[in-house]
Amino acid sequence: MMRIWLTTLLAWGVLNASSITAPLLDVQNSRATIIAENVREGMSGVIVRTFDATHSTIIANAHVEQFNPSNGRAILKLSKYDSLRQNSLPGGNWLVQPSDVAVLASDYGRALLIAPNDETYDTITKSISGIEWIHPDNYATYLSYKGHPTPLKEDFNRYCTANSIGLLYVHSADTLFTLDCKSFTLLQTAPSLKKEQKSSSPFYSRIPTIRAAWWGEGSSRLDSYEPYYLELIALNNSKNKELYELYKAKFSEKSALLRYFEIKE
C-alpha cells in the first residue's frame, strides 16, 4: 500500500482546522478587519449577525485577503452570501458592520479529494482523521450534468459552495495539495513517498463516463491527469512563492509551469 508522509501535518494546521471566530474591528466598503490566530491567506468563511440570544443569521461571505502573523491582524474581502439560493423567499439587505462576527474555516470539516486512482484515494482518506469525505462519484455526477469532463475552477467553487465543502485536496506529482475549495487558494502541501503508477482521467471515481457538452470550456476530455491539476493550481496561486519554489525544485527551472507565476527572482 502506498504510504503518505502526513504524520506531522495531521496534528496541526488547516488539515483539521476548527472554525475561527472573531469580531469585526473595522468595516470599510467591501473589506473588514479582525484579530485572530491560526489564520491563512485564502481561508474562506462567513459573516454572522446576532439579533438576540437565540436568533442569528449569515449576512455575507468572506475570505482572508491579507494576514499579518506578527500581530494577528487579518483583512477580509466581503462578498454576497450565495450558499443558499431561494428566489421565492425574501432575503435580508443587511450591510456588514463592526458589531458582526467573522467565522472562518466554517466548512473545513468537509472535503473533496481529487486522486489519480483508488489506491491513492483510499490511503489518503484513511490517513486524515476528522474529515467528512465527499465521494468523488458525487462530483463526477455534477460534472456530467454540467457537461464538463474537464473540471474547471468554477466547477469546484460552485460544487463546494452548494455542498458546504471547505477543503479541496489534490494529489498530483507525488504531492498532496490542500486548497480552500471556495477561493482556490493553496493552504498547505505534503510530499508522498511513492510515485504514482497509474491515473484515471479526470480523477478517480466509479462513474464510467462523464458526459461532454457539445462545445464550450470544460467540454473537452482531459488527456493527462497530472499536468492539468498542476497548471490549474499554479494559475490560481500565481503569487505564491512557496509553490513557485516547489515547482522549480520538482520540475527544474525551465519548466513550462513556472510561466504561470508572477514571481520576481
Located regions from the model:
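Sec-dependent N-terminal signal peptides
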Residues: I4-G13
